[in-house]
Amino acid sequence: MATCADILRSEFPEIDGQVFDYVTGVLHSGSADFESVDDLVEAVGELLQEVSGDSKDDAGIRAVCQRMYNTLRLAEPQNQGNSQVLLDAPIQLSKIMENYDCDTKLPGLLKREQSSTVNAKKLEKAEARLKAKQEKRSEKETLKTSNPLVLEEASASQAGSRKESRLESSGKNKSYDVRIENFDVSFGDRVLLAGADVNLAWGRRYGLVGRNGLGKTTLLKMLATRSLRVPAHISLLHVEQEVAGDDTPALQSVLESDTVREDLLRQERELSLRIAAGRAEGSEAAQLAEIYGKLEEIEADKAPARASVILAGLGFTPKMQQQPTREFSGGWRMRLALARALFARPDLLLLDEPTNMLDVRAILWLENYLQTWPSTILVVSHDRNFLNAIATDIIHLHSQRLDGYRGDFETFIKSKQERLLNQQREYEAQQQYRQHIQVFIDRFRYNANRASQVQSKLKMLEKLPELKPVDKESEVVLKFPDGFEKFSPPILQLDEVDFYYDPKHSIFSRLSVSADLESRICVVGENGAGKSTMLKLLMGDLSPVRGIRHAHRNLKIGYFSQHHVEQLDLNVSAVELLARKFPGLPEEEYRHQLGRYGISGELAMRPVASLSGGQKSRVAFAQMTMPCPNFYILDEPTNHLDMETIEALGQALNNFRGGVILVSHDERFIRLVCKELWVCENGSVTRVEGGFDQYRALLQEQFRREGFL
């Protein structure tokens, strides 16, 4: 096949050497920039027109460019145009020069000394156009990572019910049950739910469970925005975003969430002022009396005390309850959003992973509080103990459908196993029955005497319901690489460490802790007690004000932050993310690393922003383990992970040959992994000999003393 150089020589035999070198250089170095033949014509067309001496018209020049463009595209996969070749032997330029006299010109230079018949200005313009095109392409690549990615939004559709529509429009629908039948939910071209039904009975507490990325959070959003039709008379609240910070005190912010009470108080103030000023009409005194009656009915005078109890249960001290909301961090504002929802008492409360923002103490309080919740709750949670404590029903999202189960999570596990076992038995029994009938049909298909029986058997097969084999969810397996040499203690320790950000507020005083490669340590304590600060001291990210941090010279720490999503570039794929962090490896290596944590196939090539919370966590695990650390420090690693992945993470940490220190609020995960429990409080860290059972008992006793139980 002719090369671009061959095409140039055959079409333009008189082409100048300098122009020939320039055009071939443009063709090879800029081939990636030619998205169409028009780009190639724009780059070299004028030069070739000049070279032809007007012997070729525009169509002729375009035809030549088309031939060269086709040649470039065909050669592209091999990518051999600019490949480097290893020489068989070194070239000695001095030996070559000996064959020429001093006045003799080298052959290559003779060509370059020939006069050029091409307009120099046109040559400069062509070079400028090519440079501009390359800059434009580079700018596109920069924008790809700097601009926030615009993701597709979820959509929902559902079958309508004329009866329900008539009841809704007439105002006769007084039921507080939520019943949505035969609906679909999709995210772009991905179908999350197809022909699904959801039934939420008034006063029941539903736990919504399922693997990461199947659409649990999306379903909550569809309900919260009423994209799925929820009766208009049912009030609902979705705890999703943190409270905006302003000068409103935390306690007042919670009180304002009860819009009915706030509206009545506003009317009471306005009427009282009018009556006091002598401007009231005769009926307004009666209106004021009616408002007082309504305020008494909703126990408005007890509202501040009730709001204060909720805030205290979620960890707000009396001083914090009077602080402006703008002074709180994002985590505390999320707690404030939860407090507002609990205080407002909607007919349908939607909670998405509420325990992620809470410490163990606040979770135990929330469990106790929700057990007496009067209306309906739908909560997404991967905390088994939390669901066992609060759920009356479980909704399982899988295979694009929703299956309902009565009872808490442990009851759900047993019921699901029994259902799957029965489903498999029914399927196998029907398959045997079908085979038995099919044998009869095949045997007597061409027997005229048995024709009626064969037809009868065929009809029997047609009438049998179509049973499908059980969809078994794939097992989640995680493994942390541990191909490193063991080394002797001391491995990692803090000795008599003092630390503070502000000298007036000490965080740690004379802190002494240590860990080795056998350690499985869990750190618990209230938010703000210094758990994350201690982890940063152990890693060396923070330096002690006084005292010593000692780390073994061979120690290699892998760190998982509870804010790991903020450290990921959300605009690129998971594969590209690893390639940028650890350059120089083949793409298959990055894919293999991601596959170890369940990010495989199409998932690995999707923008990280489009992944679910749990899938983003898996990407963070893949990134953390890539350098093969021998010690892991994990800050809330179970946030957003589904239950199967939490179990797999626990097993992987137990099998890991190095050391582990983690902060977690997940009781089951703590019991699964940890051999040692540290409690962080009052500027120190103490070891609890009785483990989590003793710590839980201490918290329950504290609740009783404070009047929460």
Swiss-Prot record:
Q: Key word ATP-binding present in the record?
A: yes
Positions modified as Phosphoserine?
A: S83, S155, S157, S161, S283
Binding of ATP 1, residues: G210, R211, N212, G213, L214, G215, K216, T217
Among PANTHER family, the record links this protein to: ATP-BINDING CASSETTE SUB-FAMILY F MEMBER 3 (PTHR19211:SF117), ATP-BINDING TRANSPORT PROTEIN-RELATED (PTHR19211)
Q: What is the originating organism of this protein?
A: Mus musculus
Name of the gene this protein is made from: Abcf3
Q: Which Pfam families match?
A: ABC_tran, ABC_tran_Xtn
Q: State the SUPFAM superfamilies in the record.
A: P-loop containing nucleoside triphosphate hydrolases
Give the family, as the similarity comment puts it. Belongs to the ABC transporter superfamily. ABCF family. EF3 subfamily.
Q: GO molecular function: any one?
A: ATP hydrolysis activity
Record PTM N-acetylalanine, positions in chain:
A2
Q: Where is this region: Disordered?
A: 129-171
Q: What is this protein called?
A: ATP-binding cassette sub-family F member 3
Instruction: Cite the ABC transporter domain residue spans from the record.
Output: 178-424, 492-707
Q: Which UniProt keywords apply?
A: Acetylation, Antiviral defense, ATP-binding, Nucleotide-binding, Phosphoprotein, Repeat
Q: Which residues bind ATP 2?
A: G525, E526, N527, G528, A529, G530, K531, S532
Asked if the record carries the keyword ATP-binding, the reply is yes
UniProt lists compositionally biased (Basic and acidic residues) regions at 129-143, 161-171
A GO BP annotation = defense response to virus
Spell out the Gene3D superfamilies in the cross-references.
P-loop containing nucleotide triphosphate hydrolases (3.40.50.300)
Q: Which InterPro entries match?
A: AAA+_ATPase, ABC_tran_Xtn, ABC_transporter-like_ATP-bd, ABC_transporter-like_CS, ABCF_EF3_subfamily, P-loop_NTPase
At the top level of its lineage, which domain of life is listed?
A: Eukaryota
